[in-house]
Amino acid sequence: MSEVLPYGDEKLSPYGDGGDVGQVFSCRLQDTNNFFGAGQNKRPPKLGQIGRSKRVVIEDDRIDDVLKNMTDKAPPGV
């Protein structure tokens, strides 16, 4: 897990001129290798696999009629 640590005393600076206002300090992440999760160790997809999805099941009883009507009619302007 990453730890959030301040840069150091030299990076600390007062905020504004008021005496009651606290100090603002910057933080940095230590060990950012695992910051984005374990998915970074996966290999990239091959070129033929990009854009392909798994099987999709369409559960609509009217899908045959809709697809049939789309192929029967030519879109306007063609």
Swiss-Prot record:
<dbReference type="GO" id="GO:0008427">
    <property type="term" value="F:calcium-dependent protein kinase inhibitor activity"/>
</dbReference>
<dbReference type="GO" id="GO:0030425">
    <property type="term" value="C:dendrite"/>
</dbReference>
<protein>
    <recommendedName>
        <fullName>Calcium/calmodulin-dependent protein kinase II inhibitor 1</fullName>
    </recommendedName>
</protein>
<comment type="function">
    <text>Potent and specific inhibitor of CaM-kinase II (CAMK2). Plays a role in the maintenance of long-term retrieval-induced memory in response to contextual fear. Modulates blood pressure and vascular reactivity via regulation of CAMK2 activity in addition to regulation of left ventricular mass. Mediates the NLRP3 inflammasome in cardiomyocytes via acting as an inhibitor of the MAPK14/p38 and MAPK8/JNK pathways, thereby regulating ventricular remodeling and cardiac rhythm post-myocardial infarction.</text>
</comment>
<dbReference type="GO" id="GO:0045202">
    <property type="term" value="C:synapse"/>
</dbReference>
<keyword id="KW-0966">Cell projection</keyword>
<feature type="region of interest" description="CAMK2 inhibitory domain">
    <location>
        <begin position="41"/>
        <end position="68"/>
    </location>
</feature>
<dbReference type="GO" id="GO:0050729">
    <property type="term" value="P:positive regulation of inflammatory response"/>
</dbReference>
<dbReference type="Pfam" id="PF15170">
    <property type="entry name" value="CaM-KIIN"/>
</dbReference>
<dbReference type="GO" id="GO:0014069">
    <property type="term" value="C:postsynaptic density"/>
</dbReference>
<keyword id="KW-0770">Synapse</keyword>
<comment type="similarity">
    <text>Belongs to the CAMK2N family.</text>
</comment>
<keyword id="KW-0649">Protein kinase inhibitor</keyword>
<comment type="subunit">
    <text>Interacts with CAMK2B; the presence of Ca(2+)/calmodulin increases the interaction but is not essential. Interacts with CAMK2A; this interaction requires CAMK2A activation by Ca(2+).</text>
</comment>
<dbReference type="InterPro" id="IPR026779">
    <property type="entry name" value="Camk2n"/>
</dbReference>
<dbReference type="GO" id="GO:0007616">
    <property type="term" value="P:long-term memory"/>
</dbReference>
<dbReference type="GO" id="GO:0019901">
    <property type="term" value="F:protein kinase binding"/>
</dbReference>
